[in-house]
Regions:
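Short edge beta-strands and adjacent turn/loop segments
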Residues: 22-49, 325
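Extreme N-terminal, non-catalytic leader segments
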Residues: 30-33, 51, 58-121, 369
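C-terminal boundary of histidine-terminating zinc-finger modules
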Residues: 337-350
């Protein structure tokens, strides 16, 4: 005769170990978020700590906890009660996440970091740099990689809108910022800290401080890839990124238009002055396929190849054209709705072309141990 399984506290904790805090990406059991476990016969009641009152992930955490507990063999009624951490508990959590670090540091500046960092740049605005950043990041996240985005375009921030996370502000735990996650991508932007569409009116030093905070004060976890969406041109932010994250590689975005390509070269030649590597060139808004199958080159053709060839000569290195992204209305449409085209319409021409570029970016970088971390601006 079969005996009924008696649920134990160990069973409950093992189940809860499958529940992650969505903002931190670690099991709630490892984060000391399980407040209590009470078992009465076959009924199970658990208490779970949230990092802050009004936690935006409360429904997700509660639902996931309830789901794993209801899968327990022989379980009866399941109840989940939510509590809020005290200031002392939040400090302990922040200390645990920082590990041996006594204060904020930029993990991506560590010579042993394995995170591949891409600074996405363009000579001028309007070439689709931010759209490329968001879709490349989302494409890699869809393949199972851990990906983040820093919206370093402080004045022209657009990442929250393109990711559909305008209404998701970051959670702050003892001065450590937990970035929102959308489509599997952690991302941070100054747009998450301002009211509505208010402009940012800052001078250079404030820009530098913002980038430092995004890199050091945000909990990124163990990222495979970090994208930094730079502002157009070669100003303060581009230099700041080169100095704070010297192993960042430049991804140059241009259009086929000759004038845009010429300006894009300037964004690429900053690599000579900062000793950065150029990962490649992306040509956006390439030919548009018409209903009859013909291709209309609305913005001309050859701009991407021109930039790649010219930068190869100027930097004495092999700078490849990683891909040409066709002019596809779906790319714009899904950008407006915050649903990147690579996941919302994966079979569209633009999505396929972007994934082909993403496939060339997903390898973790080599360690910079023993190499100079002080790029000079010549």
């Amino acid at each position: 005769m079969a005996t009924e399984h008696t649920i134990t506290e160990a069973d409950v904790l093992a189940a809860l170990a499958r529940v992650e805090d969505p903002e931190i990406g670690k099991p709630i059991t490892e984060l000391d978020m399980v407040e209590s476990v009470r078992i009465t016969g076959a009924d199970v009641a658990v208490g779970i700590y949230l990092t802050i009152a009004g936690c935006p992930m409360r429904d997700t955490i509660e639902g996931n906890a309830r789901a794993v507990l209801e899968e327990l063999d022989g379980v009866g009624e399941v109840s989940v009660a939510l509590h809020t951490m005290s200031d002392e508990q939040r400090r302990a959590l922040a200390l645990k996440l920082r590990g041996e670090q006594t204060g904020p540091v930029i993990p991506f500046a560590d010579p042993d970091t394995r995170t591949r960092i891409y600074a996405v740049a363009s000579g001028k605005g309007g070439v689709g740099k931010s759209s490329m950043t968001v879709n490349l990041a989302t494409a890699l996240a869809a393949q199972g990689l851990t990906v983040g985005i820093v919206d370093a375009d402080i004045y022209g921030h657009s990442v929250p809108g393109l990711m559909g996370s305008d209404d998701k502000g970051p959670t702050v735990v003892d001065e450590m910022i937990m970035p929102p996650i959308a489509h599997g991508v952690r991302h941070i932007s100054v747009g998450q800290f301002v009211e509505g569409n208010a402009p940012i009116v800052w001078r250079g030093p404030m820009l530098t401080r913002a980038i430092q905070q995004f890199l050091a004060d945000v909990y990124w976890g163990d990222l495979d890839v970090l994208f930094m969406d730079l502002p157009p041109g070669t100003g303060d932010v581009a230099i700041t990124v080169a100095q704070l994250v010297p192993n960042a590689e430049l991804l140059i975005v241009t259009t086929p238009q000759a004038a845009a390509a010429e300006v894009a070269e300037r964004a690429g030649t900053i690599a000579q002055q900062t000793d950065q590597k150029i990962a490649g060139v992306i040509e956006n808004m390439s030919g548009m396929t018409m209903p009859d199958g013909t291709v209309m080159n609305i913005f001309g053709e050859g701009g991407g190849e021109q930039v790649a060839e010219r930068l190869t000569q100027l930097t004495d290195s092999d700078v490849a054209l990683l891909g040409s992204i066709p002019l596809d209305p779906t790319l714009r449409e899904h950008g407006d709705t915050g649903t990147p085209v690579v996941i919302s319409e994966p079979d569209s021409p633009a999505a396929k072309a972007i994934r082909a570029v993403a496939d060339q970016l997903k390898v973790r970088r080599e360690s910079l141990a023993g190499k100079s971390l002080n790029p000079r601006v010549k």
